[in-house]
Design a protein with these regions (language model features):
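Residue-level detector of anion-binding/catalytic polar loops
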Residues: 23, 58, 114
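Conserved FAD-binding catalytic core of PHBH/FMO-like flavoproteins
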Residues: 106, 113, 117-123, 127-264
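Glycine-rich FAD pyrophosphate-binding loop
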Residues: 18-39
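Glycine-rich, N-terminal phosphate-binding loop of Rossmann-like dinucleotide-binding domains
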Residues: 34, 155-156, 287
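Conserved Walker B
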Residues: 30, 157, 283-284
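Conserved mid-domain beta->alpha element of the FAD-binding
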Residues: 4-19, 23, 104, 152, ...
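Active-site-adjacent segment of FAD-dependent monooxygenases/related oxidoreductases
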Residues: 36-40, 45-111, 125-128
Length: 317
């Protein structure tokens, strides 16, 4: 199986196929250092954690992940805690996407898996037949080709895979929301042990975290805002204003390691299969980061896709 994209979807699919005895090659346009440092979602739902443990990828997750048994909804300067574990028997775990990627890369390389980083000129051929091909230029500048039994397009919303499905076959649905998120990663301990989702007249705010030393915070802003207009002082002032609560709340400040503005949009393409090309993760659907669903949906996709490819390639069904 040729897999385009070394994000969580592509790497986990490669690992699942390996466990089923099916070889794969993962092609990635970026460097290993880049994909291992991309700050993305950090909330793993219980089925995602269960699967990672099931396939031997839970050791560091269990050591370093932060289980959350509830979350707070903050309205009118008052907290309303939702006791997730008490109500459902399950929890969420805070563990950065880049950490999941590190674990997956380490597992694939330890098993002798083939991941090619810094490839370019990727193109998919003959995906409508039984012998699809991927042509590309490798990291050393040499042209190369993979002959595959199937191709998994796990290269996100801007990759080549989705665009390879003919326009007359695919249907796209999208919606742009009239707001964006300004997100920061701050080198400071979290100000609260759980996530806080805040409703405020000036806009939404979210207190989250990536580790006991790193806090992730978000502000709802206009999609036309320029990050250059948001110096540290303005960001912290707005966070203090929106996260204020009766009874006292101390927002810990620290150096900003990352900042950016993300437009809120939803996108879905169908079908997710065309011939021997299968789309997964952001290549097939994008949801706003408001619910931290992106990586969890990608994991759910490849869990199903791995089973389907195993049936196709080992049982011809």
């Amino acid at each position: 199986v040729g897999i385009v994209g070394a994000g969580p979807a592509g790497l986990l699919l490669s690992h699942l196929l390996h466990l089923a005895g099916i070889e794969s090659v993962v092609l990635e346009a970026r460097s290993r250092a880049h994909v291992q440092s991309r700050v993305r979602a950090g909330v793993l739902e219980q089925p995602t954690v269960d699967l990672l443990r099931e396939v031997g990828l839970g050791a560091r997750l269990d050591r370093e992940g932060l289980p959350h048994h509830g979350l707070s909804l903050r309205f009118d300067r008052t907290d309303h805690r939702i006791a997730l574990s008490e109500l459902t028997g399950r929890c969420i775990t805070v563990y950065g996407q880049q950490e999941v990627v590190k674990d997956l890369i380490a597992a694939r390389l330890a098993a002798g898996g083939r991941i090619e980083f810094e490839v370019s000129d990727v193109a998919l051929h003959d995906v409508g037949g039984d012998a699809p091909r991927i042509s590309y230029t490798d990291a050393d500048g040499h042209p190369a080709e993979l002959r595959c039994d199937a191709i998994a397009g796990c290269d996100g919303s801007h990759g080549v895979s989705r665009a390879t499905v003919p326009a007359g076959v695919r249907t796209e649905y999208q919606h742009a929301y009239p707001f964006a998120w300004l997100g920061i990663l701050a080198k400071t301990p979290p100000s609260h042990e759980e996530l806080i989702y805040t409703h405020h007249e000036r806009g939404f705010a979210l207190h989250s975290m990536r580790s006991p030393e790193l806090t992730r915070l978000y502000l709802q802003v206009d999609p036309g805002e320029d990050i250059a207009d948001w110096p540290d002082e303005r960001i912290w002032s707005e966070l203090h204003e929106r996260l204020a609560v009766d009874g006292g709340f101390t927002l810990h400040e620290g150096p900003l390691l990352d900042r950016g503005i993300t437009p809120m949009r939803s996108f879905v393409v169908e079908p997710m299969r065309y011939g021997r090309l299968f789309l997964a993760g952001d290549a097939a659907h994008i949801v706003p980061p408001t619910g931290a669903k992106g990586m969890n949906l990608a994991v759910a996709d490849v869990r199903v896709l791995a089973r389907a490819l195993t049936a196709l390639l080992t049982e011809n069904r």
